From Swiss-Prot:
Residues 1-30 form the signal peptide. Pathway: Glycan degradation; chitin degradation. This is Lytic chitin monooxygenase. Residues 31-168 form the Chitin-binding type-4 domain. It is found in: Secreted. It catalyses: [(1->4)-N-acetyl-beta-D-glucosaminyl]n+m + reduced acceptor + O2 = [(1->4)-N-acetyl-beta-D-glucosaminyl]m-1-(1->4)-2-(acetylamino)-2-deoxy-D-glucono-1,5-lactone + [(1->4)-N-acetyl-beta-D-glucosaminyl]n + acceptor + H2O. It comes from Streptomyces ambofaciens (strain ATCC 23877 / 3486 / DSM 40053 / JCM 4204 / NBRC 12836 / NRRL B-2516). GO terms for biological process: chitin catabolic process; polysaccharide catabolic process.
Length: 172
């Protein structure tokens, strides 16, 4: 091997680990969010509302089970907790369909829906792995007018859940 070629190979071998470490990693932690009616993170992804990191990761609002925040306790997505941000409000009937778009399916214990801190719907999947789209019929009962719905996807085999807030006008 010529001296110049040996030098080039050595330089290449020395730089390869540096280049590999500096390249952005592909997201292996994609999961899911409410796509319809549009959740706050769906509105961010669509550009309906100006947002930060959540614009590129609407499926990534994950946090410990039992939280009540739209951001799932994730400071990177804190704008989802801001009720004054100008979120679009979607008119829905008293018995509305909520659609989750899942980019990675996890064994699921339950799906929960809350309004004003009160659970209004619970769907038990018993550890089943869902498909790429999951629809739930949620009955708002006597609630009407503008409401903020907190939807929670509780993963069966971890201590985490996925969170989404949806601004709706029930009966509107």
């Amino acid at each position: 091997m010529h001296a110049g070629r040996k030098t080039a190979v050595l330089i290449g071998a020395a730089l390869a680990p540096v280049i590999a470490v500096s390249l952005p990693a592909a997201s292996a932690s994609a999961h899911g969010y409410i796509s319809n009616p549009p959740s706050r993170q769906a509105q961010c992804a669509a550009g309906t509302v100006s947002c930060g990191d959540i614009t590129y990761e609407p499926q990534s609002v994950e946090g410990p089970k039992g939280l009540t925040s739209c951001s799932g306790g994730n400071s990177r997505f804190a704008e989802l907790d801001d009720d004054s941000k100008g979120w679009a409000v979607t008119p829905v009937p008293r018995n509305a369909t909520f659609s989750w778009k899942l980019t990675a399916q996890h064994s699921t214990s339950t799906w929960e829906y809350y309004v004003g801190g009160q659970r209004i719907a619970l769907f038990d999947d018993g550890g089943a792995k869902p498909g790429a789209v999951v629809d739930h019929q949620v009955d708002f009962g006597g609630l009407d007018g503008r409401q903020k719905v907190l939807a929670v996807w509780n993963v069966a085999d971890t201590d985490n859940a996925f969170y989404a807030c949806i601004d709706v006008n029930v009966g509107g």
